[in-house]
Amino acid sequence: MLTRPACRSVAYAETFKDRSVVAAYRHRPPHPPGTFDLLRQLIVDRPRSLLDAGTGLGDLARALAPNCDRVDAVDFSERMIEMARSLPGGDDPRIRWLCSPIEDADLIGPYSLITAADSLSWFDLNVVIPKFAELLTENGVLAVVDRSAQVGLREDDIIPRYSLNRDYERWDPVAALEKAGLFERLGQECSGPVPWTPTIEEYIERRHSQNGFSRDRMSRRRATDFDAALRARIAEQVKEGSVRMEEGRLLGEVAGSVVWGRPVPRLRATSERGILGPTRQ
């Protein structure tokens, strides 16, 4: 069995149902245009159907719907789904919004593309990977989408000091799946970087959209002190020139990454390697 680290437990995932987190989510950096271009190219089978697993505010679902016959956009946060519906493209009739954990969702395959943007690490991979394998078309793939944004801010000492996720550790779910023989990587492509220019307040709110920084869960004092620490560090680095601002906006950038491949059915993985056995040499 693949075991998620404690920092990716259901208890921590519940943060994404919080009203404050959903409100702050729109301040996350956008995916670079190249990410969407690549995802469109990965849809080769018909029907041109997309499953966006852990859709959040539906950034991928809303952008790709015009290129699809149908889209199932799934998230376990009702507030996320409500917000996604209200955003541009959220009323596209090709999108079916489903509020459900992906593990239990009532899905109607087959899908020519399954996307997981910043969400795969929160799933029970022992359940969803065999499920995805069954739902894909012959040439369909699972695309794991990531993005990284930076403005040059030194905050590695600030983040752990205030985060409520005391179990945080870096974990790569794709690497874990590959090691277990449950994912066959077919390709990887990066896009960007492209400019990202948030205001200071937008940058801070972006942090509050992340696990560990929900305003609904932090004490008012803790949240206020966290915000003040970020503002002070930004001011310090702007003064020294290591963080740049122009017309009230931070000058940063965002890059995207897509890893795509085929999820491996459980029976095949078990027969080839033993039950989640050692990595094939």
Regions found by a protein language model. Give the residues of each.
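A short acidic, Gly/Pro-enriched loop at the edge of an enzyme's catalytic core
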Residues: 106-114
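Conserved catalytic/acceptor-binding region of the Class I
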Residues: 133-200
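A short, conserved alpha-helix within the catalytic core of class I
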Residues: 123-132
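A short beta-strand submotif of the Rossmann-like class I SAM-dependent methyltransferase core
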Residues: 113-117, 125
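Conserved class I S-adenosyl-L-methionine
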Residues: 2-45
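Conserved acidic residues
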Residues: 48, 69, 112
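Conserved Class I S-adenosyl-L-methionine
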Residues: 176, 180-281
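Class I SAM-dependent methyltransferase SAM/SAH-binding core
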Residues: 51, 57-104
